[in-house]
């Protein structure tokens, strides 16, 4: 039993730290004293001698896709830890807000592509809300080392420690260590709560789901954006467009594909009730747009240093790499029957040769990133350009060969792609697949999930997020009706499809579309104040509505503009919903 003297001393210590300045606490000595002691977390040993601490004053950001502009002070601290018996080192970095700005919040951040972190790119989105922000190198070597560089110990030998760390362990450990350090750093009592959040997009979105599925008791709120879940299918599907080109023996110019994309947008734009250059209803587009209508339409493009399609249309750095960029000559012509067939086949999704469905594709209006070709000056022809994310996944993760891409797609068929998907599921089902549908631990802990996905994402199909939402609903509410289970799940898990948005960013092909830049603020209000996001707040970042606010409908409701396009409402449209629902009969087991 504690004496009154010890209780008073503890209270005085807490009060003193909370009243301290950033300069007082942002020292190596104070950080070392705040680190979790050996034995705090089973199997982890923190190296106190590795700690660094540097105060930063009056830092500012002009804002980004996931946070607004702000000015703030913080303590930039780092340290390393190891796993007992592994002979490894993992580095972590945190920004701790100044003591007077700390709101007892913590935020873990993730990466993109094969990177487990995005550096400090997302940290401002934490400290401006009074939250510690953290990232990890995952024990891969350093903050710049990506998984694909270390996934193999040698040909035929998978680095399973790296797979498990990248898959879910490293972010979970980052969160636990960050919160434990914060308690001492800020002089908090052991039973004081730190609201714990995660935010990430693409690979960062997959990492977010890994935390919900594996560390449900640690988090109060998670924002998984455009997640690269269903990893086996997601990575291999990047090769699907290439295999369609190889199968048809047709390799279109970017200009020809660009024409089809622009015509799709033009036709489908007004289907939502407002003509604004944004395809808000890609489902209606699927129901009403006929790609054959583009046959024979003229196209013309000036020479460019790189392809006009792809990640140039979004402002964020690449998170899921497609084919390499290459210079393109001036091009003109008319849309060919071969191009129409190619586009329709891609949009239909991947089927086996005997007609079984294996995976969905992108929504109409999204750019055909994976179908980009390369131009050969000597032959004056466009040639196959194998999407590197998919190719490298096959060589390193499935074939276990230290090769950065497939040398060719000779003898690769649609069935080959499905076989690769099945093989990857068997190998990485418990680590990278990240589609466990039973979220009972997270739900029981009172956690909230705010998931979002751009409808015109051309790297990770938005149908992927819809399918996972429906998988969770079917497992968590097996005996409830669609409407009842959707309403019940909406109390803690909401999915928002962002009209016109590209991969984890706004879209210059549809510049008048909104983007949700304040998701963490929305989630904080939901978690801490009980303000349910019936719709998701967004902002028009460019175009004719720049600076205005927008609202995004929660799945399964879909946006429709009424009163001559002046008012938006969220409607239930069964025919549209049905376009998002798929039966994967190419697999013997359920594909969540």
Q: Language-model features: where?
A:
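Acidic, glycine-anchored loop motifs typical of Ca2+
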Residues: 273-281, 303
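Active-site rim elements
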Residues: 164-167, 251-255, 328-331, 455-456, ...
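Short, well-ordered loop/turn and helix-capping segments at boundaries between secondary-structure elements
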Residues: 228, 241, 270, 274, ...
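Catalytic-loop region of hydrolases
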Residues: 15-104, 120-121, 288-407, 513-516, ...
């Amino acid at each position: 039993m504690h004496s009154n003297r010890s209780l008073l001393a503890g209270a005085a210590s807490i009060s003193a730290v909370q009243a301290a300045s950033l300069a007082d606490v942002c020292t190596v000595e104070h950080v070392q004293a705040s680190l979790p002691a050996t034995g705090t977390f089973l199997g982890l040993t923190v190296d106190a001698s590795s700690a660094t601490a540097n105060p930063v004053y009056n830092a500012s950001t002009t804002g980004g896709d996931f946070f607004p502009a702000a000015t703030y002070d913080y303590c930039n601290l780092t340290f390393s830890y190891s796993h007992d018996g592994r002979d490894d080192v993992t580095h972590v970095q945190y920004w701790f807000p100044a003591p007077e700005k700390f709101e007892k919040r913590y935020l873990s951040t993730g990466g993109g592509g094969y990177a487990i972190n995005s550096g400090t790119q997302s940290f401002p989105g934490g400290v401006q809300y009074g939250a510690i922000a953290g990232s990890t190198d995952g024990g891969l070597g350093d903050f710049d080392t990506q998984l694909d560089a270390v996934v193999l110990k040698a040909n035929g030998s998978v680095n399973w420690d790296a797979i498990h760390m990248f898959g879910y362990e490293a972010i979970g450990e980052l969160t636990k260590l960050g919160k434990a350090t914060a308690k001492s750093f800020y002089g908090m009592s052991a039973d004081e709560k730190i609201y714990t959040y995660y935010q990430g997009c693409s690979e960062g979105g997959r990492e977010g789901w890994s935390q919900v599925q594996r560390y449900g008791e640690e988090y109060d709120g998670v924002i998984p954006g455009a997640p690269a879940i269903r990893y086996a299918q997601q990575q291999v599907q990047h090769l699907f467009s290439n295999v369609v080109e190889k199968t048809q023996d047709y390799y279109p110019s970017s200009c020809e594909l660009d024409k089809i994309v622009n015509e799709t947008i033009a036709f489908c734009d007004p289907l939502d009730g407002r003509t604004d250059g944004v395809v808000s209803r890609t489902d209606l587009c699927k129901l009403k747009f006929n790609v054959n209508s583009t046959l024979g339409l003229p196209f013309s493009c000036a020479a460019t240093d790189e392809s006009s399609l792809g990640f140039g249309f979004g402002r964020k750095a690449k998170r899921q790499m497609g084919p390499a960029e290459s210079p393109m000559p001036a091009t003109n012509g008319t849309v060919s029957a071969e191009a129409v067939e190619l586009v329709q086949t891609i949009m239909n999704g991947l089927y086996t040769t005997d007609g079984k469905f294996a995976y969905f594709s992108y929504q109409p209006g999204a750019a055909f990133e994976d179908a980009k070709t390369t131009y050969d000056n000597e032959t004056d022809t466009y040639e196959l350009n194998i999407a590197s994310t998919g190719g490298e996944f096959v060589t390193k993760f499935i074939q276990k060969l230290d090769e950065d891409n497939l040398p060719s797609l000779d003898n690769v068929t649609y069935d080959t792609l499905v076989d690769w998907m099945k093989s990857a599921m068997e190998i990485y089902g418990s680590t990278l697949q990240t589609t466990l549908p039973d979220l009972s631990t997270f739900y029981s802990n009172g956690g909230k999930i705010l998931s979002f996905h751009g409808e015109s994402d051309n790297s990770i199909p938005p149908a992927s997020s819809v399918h996972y939402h429906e998988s969770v609903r079917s497992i968590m509410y097996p005996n409830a009706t669609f409407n009842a289970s959707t309403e019940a799940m909406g109390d803690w898990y909401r999915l928002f499809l962002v009209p016109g948005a590209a991969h984890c960013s706004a879209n210059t092909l549809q510049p008048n579309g909104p983007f949700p830049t304040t998701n963490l603020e929305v989630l904080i209000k939901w978690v801490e104040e009980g303000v349910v996001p019936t719709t998701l707040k967004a902002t028009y970042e460019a175009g004719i509505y720049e600076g205005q606010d927008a609202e995004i409908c929660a799945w399964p409701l879909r946006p429709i503009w009424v009163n001559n396009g002046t008012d938006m409402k969220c409607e239930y449209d069964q025919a549209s919903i049905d376009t998002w629902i798929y039966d994967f009969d190419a697999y013997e087991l359920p594909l969540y």
